[in-house]
Amino acid sequence: MIQQQTMLDVADNSGAKRVMCIKVLGGTRRKYASIGDVIVVSIKEAIPQAKVKKGEVARAVIVRTAREVKRPDGSYIRFDGNSAVLINKDLEPIGTRIFGPVARELRARKFMKIISLAPEVL
């Protein structure tokens, strides 16, 4: 569960390291986001010569959450931390590589480019 002010790690090579959620997209007064949801983030930490700079506002899709997510078969999946991948307006990833595993729920949300770049899909 991600809400406003939540800090997330960035799981791609766009150059951002840490981002903060500033808005959960999808519906009025929506409070929480989970795996596969698109959020608006502010970049809080970035490396030099990055595609994005500190202080920029971007969109991101959540790929890992520390809060468990229930699957249709009754099983649960959770990760060690909260991570996101930065995306552009066309929902394409800004980076060219994804680090760490991503959840299978992204496939149902049509984020096939992220699924194909990820080293492992759980």
From Swiss-Prot:
GO terms classed as biological process: translation
What keywords tag this UniProt record?
Ribonucleoprotein, Ribosomal protein, RNA-binding, rRNA-binding
A cellular component term (GO) from this record? cytosolic large ribosomal subunit
Q: Which family does it belong to?
A: Belongs to the universal ribosomal protein uL14 family.
The UniProt entry, under PROSITE patterns, shows: RIBOSOMAL_L14
Give the quaternary structure.
Part of the 50S ribosomal subunit. Forms a cluster with proteins L3 and L19. In the 70S ribosome, L14 and L19 interact and together make contacts with the 16S rRNA in bridges B5 and B8.
Function per UniProt: Binds to 23S rRNA. Forms part of two intersubunit bridges in the 70S ribosome.
Q: Which domain of life is it from?
A: Bacteria
Gene3D superfamilies, per database record? Ribosomal protein L14
Q: Which HAMAP family match?
A: Ribosomal_uL14
Which pairs of Cys residues are joined through disulfide bonds in the record? none
What is the native source organism of this protein?
Anaeromyxobacter dehalogenans (strain 2CP-C)
MF annotations from Gene Ontology:
large ribosomal subunit rRNA binding; structural constituent of ribosome
**Ribonucleoprotein: present as a keyword of the record?**
yes
Q: Under what name is this protein listed?
A: Large ribosomal subunit protein uL14
Task: Fetch the InterPro entries from UniProt.
Answer: Ribosomal_uL14, Ribosomal_uL14_bac-type, Ribosomal_uL14_CS, Ribosomal_uL14_sf
Q: What is the lineage of its organism?
A: Bacteria, Pseudomonadati, Myxococcota, Myxococcia, Myxococcales
